[in-house]
Amino acid sequence: MWYNNQLTQSLNIQYPIIQAGMAGSTTAELVATVSNKGGLGCIGAGYFTTKKLEQEIQKVQGLTSQPFGVNLFVPSHQSYTNEQVEHMNAWLKPYRKALNLEEPVVNISEEQQFKSAIQTVIKYRVPVCCFTFGIPSKEIIEQLKGAKITLIGTATTVDEAIANEHAGMDIVVAQGSEAGGHRGSFLTTNNQREPLIGTMSLIPQIVDHVSIPVVAAGGVMDGRGILASQILGAQGVQMGTAFLTTEESGANQLVKQAVLHSKETDTIVTDVFSGKSARGINNEFVETMKQYEGNIPPYPVQNQLTNSIRKTAASTGHREWTHMWSGQSPRLATSQHVNQLMDRLVEQVKTLLTVVR
């Protein structure tokens, strides 16, 4: 069976399909439905307060008895200067004025928020905990493993995958450059540039260098992508954009429609929205902010500075001023219920296997 392997056994799920964290766009209904249909639904908790995370976990637990996960951002510890913030506030002033917004106060509480989230995951016995932007400390990994929680890391290079395995991750997601949303990169490359290795190149190279199960992410939207990923050596897939446009997704309708009506040439990788590289649909804000390249405050500072602009723009229909995360396969996105998407994915793989045989 294409779905019976080390990955599905480790996660105690039927199908090797993981719904990506998609911070800010997941709902309890989305997560629970994916899990109820045999995949692994994940709460995108990167921006959650402890109270919000507790509420979401309880909602999901009330909707499913199947395994699910919580996706967390590992604190980045990036330094920044007050001058950077002052300059960015000056550059963002026209947007705030147009949207009638006040200048925000930067409040960095990443570390405290992350540690609190870990304790919440343990308290509520969440079966799986996923990480991006790095690897948590040895102490945190030991705490989670002591609670019998399965750990999933993220890698955009072979070295990052090896680091995840050495740290004690049970599974690693190989995130190709096609993936929508934030890049999970955390190790510096020889040329000091953000690694942008495509899924087809990344998967087999990571598979050859680690012994833990590898999950393919980036551009996977249907049964063809699932089967192709397995042929490359991945034991499963992580899908974001495919779930982003479903009825149960918490993404703004403006974003959903933008993805559904975009082409493969419409996405770019930019750090202007959050201070960390992410793939999304190009727009006026990205083009305007390009002139400040090299002067963007790091995540999470830039994320806080642009947060109210992005949220207000999205809620008032200003698609040119908000982030619209999407992978490179928007033409394959569909608007349907999650259970329909899951059924379609499974049927597509079955049909393809019949043809191949």
UniProtKB/Swiss-Prot annotation:
It comes from Staphylococcus haemolyticus (strain JCSC1435). SUPFAM superfamilies: Inosine monophosphate dehydrogenase (IMPDH) (SSF51412). This is Probable nitronate monooxygenase. InterPro entries: Aldolase_TIM (IPR013785), NMO (IPR004136). Nitronate monooxygenase that uses molecular oxygen to catalyze the oxidative denitrification of alkyl nitronates. Acts on propionate 3-nitronate (P3N), the presumed physiological substrate. Probably functions in the detoxification of P3N, a metabolic poison produced by plants and fungi as a defense mechanism. Belongs to the nitronate monooxygenase family. NMO class I subfamily. Binds 1 FMN per subunit. One of its GO terms (molecular function) is nucleotide binding. Its cofactor is FMN. Pfam families: NMO. P3N is a potent irreversible inhibitor of the key enzyme succinate dehydrogenase in the Krebs cycle and electron transport chain. P3N has been shown to be a toxic metabolite to bacteria, plants, fungi, mammals or any organism that uses succinate dehydrogenase. PANTHER family: NITRONATE MONOOXYGENASE-RELATED (PTHR42747:SF3). FMN binds at residues 71, 175, 180, 219, 238-241. It catalyses: 3 propionate 3-nitronate + 3 O2 + H2O = 3 3-oxopropanoate + 2 nitrate + nitrite + H2O2 + 3 H(+). CDD domains: NPD_like (cd04730). Keywords: Detoxification, Flavoprotein, FMN, Monooxygenase, Nucleotide-binding, Oxidoreductase. Its EC number is 1.13.12.-. One of its GO terms (biological process) is response to toxic substance.
